[in-house]
Amino acid sequence: PALFGGVYYVMTKTYSWDAIILSIPSMLVTVTLLYIHTVMDFDFDLNEGHKTVANSFNSQLDSLIVLKWLLILAYVTPLLLCIFDILDWQVFIVWFTIPLAVDLYKSMVDFSANAESIPEHKWYHFPMENMMNAPSFMTRIYQSRNLMIYYSLFLALAIILALN
């Protein structure tokens, strides 16, 4: 949110709470990408003594509760933006990415059980050339990256449509 607020200030020379509030959903999916990385590094970070949110849980699987809540909040926040009349109903276009979020979560559950597992290839996983030969770790980073990109693009579209 501070980044969005700062960019808004540089462009307009005014401060706006709207810019910060509108950035919260996008921030949640960005934090999801970062958190997924720490979940996949769970054992390494634990062995190296690195303190992360993920390794504060008893197991890698237990740490997925934070991921679940990040994803839930990412999809509830647009509803709140609509309820509080910050954005119009167009904001629900981000809900088209819910299947990607569910797929990502299931993929992380599989990773927790078997770090070498490769998720089933879906049309929205591109660009991931040679996906079946990509390491399991990178495949999930790409999944999370794609969710972040699609979600943010749909959110930007909703904001643009609300301005008209």
Which role fits each region the language model picked out?
Residues 1-32, 65-164:
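Hydrophobic alpha-helical transmembrane segments
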Residues 27-72:
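Solvent-exposed interhelical
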